């Protein structure tokens, strides 16, 4: 039997919501129904935007009857904020809270059936956010960043030293109004970048829409913050059910550390994938993970 016509995906609306005085841009997907529905709030990882394969996930979710709000963090994509490409952890966590509040305010949305979905660095953000929001119905954390120290140790020590030097230069310069010192997000092995594992550069480029000019760099000062960010340590406080989608050969967010933090989550499920950090967004790997996520959603937050 085919899908109900009520769940035929509709073209998303381009919407904006306020986060600490600035506007965040988002796609709002709604299933074609008059019924009140759950909503999935979604955002990307390290320097990622809503256009980098998140729409593929949202289209599959809305086809199953879920509304989706897919947003860009401040300073990235179509959202406001200067300087551009400023990756600030505190700001991004504020954006998550603002996005959830906006989602709860929408008509035909059940404010008590809000799911948050994050991937990579965003996969860590949803864990930190859920620890502080007991109203959330569920969490999906995909190939999540959970531990700054472990992720830093996965990097070549020489690269770490170079990045630290650039970060200090950027941070000091920012105090005197200098332009940001930028570092690449992804680069081939041997090059200085936040991600330079063998699969990083080609995998990152595969997320880019055809013909796009999404910047592949961020302000270097972020390096000074990442090692002090441990969203995985908050998992014991999360009350909502959490689905962890773990890439067993993850070169960016070590799976062993993710599994350790996941084990402390009171209500959790773990799905393993024999894929790398970037493979999970495309092809058969994407099909496997999105199928598992839909199964989780249907069981935990069913569409009425």
Give, region by region, the residue ranges found by the protein language model.
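N-terminal cap/lid segment of alpha/beta-hydrolase-fold proteins
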Residues: 2-35
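The serine-hydrolase catalytic nucleophile loop
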Residues: 47-59, 73, 256
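Catalytic nucleophile-loop/oxyanion-hole region of alpha/beta-hydrolase
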Residues: 50, 76-111, 115, 283-289
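Conserved alpha/beta-hydrolase
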Residues: 60-80
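Alpha/beta-hydrolase-fold enzymes
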Residues: 127-207
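Short beta-strand/loop motif that positions the catalytic acidic residue
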Residues: 238, 244-246
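Conserved alpha/beta-hydrolase "acid-adjacent" motif
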Residues: 251-257
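Catalytic active-site module of serine/aspartate enzymes centered on a nucleophile-bearing elbow/loop
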Residues: 273-304
């Amino acid at each position: 039997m085919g899908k109900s016509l009520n769940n035929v995906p509709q073209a998303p609306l381009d919407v904006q919501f306020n986060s600490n005085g600035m506007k965040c841009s988002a796609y709002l997907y709604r299933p074609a129904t008059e019924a009140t529905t759950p909503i999935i709030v979604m955002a990307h990882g390290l320097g990622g935007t809503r256009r980098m394969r998140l729409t593929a996930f949202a289209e599959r979710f809305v086809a199953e009857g879920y509304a989706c709000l897919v947003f860009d963090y401040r300073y990235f994509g179509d959202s406001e904020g200067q300087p551009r490409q400023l990756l600030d952890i505190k700001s991004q966590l504020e954006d998550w809270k603002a996005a959830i509040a906006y989602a709860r305010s929408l008509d035909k949305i059940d404010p008590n059936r809000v799911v948050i979905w994050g991937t990579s660095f965003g996969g860590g953000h949803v864990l930190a956010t859920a620890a502080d929001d007991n109203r959330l119905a569920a969490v999906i954390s995909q190939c999540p960043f959970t531990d700054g120290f472990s992720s830093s140790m996965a990097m070549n020590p020489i690269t770490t030293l170079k990045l630290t030097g650039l970060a200090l230069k950027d941070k000091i310069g920012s105090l005197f109004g200098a332009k940001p010192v930028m570092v690449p997000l992804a680069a081939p092995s041997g090059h200085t970048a936040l991600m330079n594992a063998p699969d990083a550069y080609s995998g990152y480029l595969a997320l880019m829409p055809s013909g796009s000019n999404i910047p592949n760099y961020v302000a270097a000062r972020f390096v000074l913050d990442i090692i002090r960010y441990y969203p995985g340590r908050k998992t014991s406080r999360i009350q909502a059910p959490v689905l962890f989608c773990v890439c067993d050969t993850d070169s960016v967010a070590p799976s062993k550390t993710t599994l350790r933090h996941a084990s402390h989550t009171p209500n959790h499920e773990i799905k393993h994938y024999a894929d790398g950090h970037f493979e999970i967004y495309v092809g058969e790997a994407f099909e496997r993970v999105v199928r598992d996520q839909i199964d989780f959603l249907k069981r935990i937050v069913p569409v009425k």
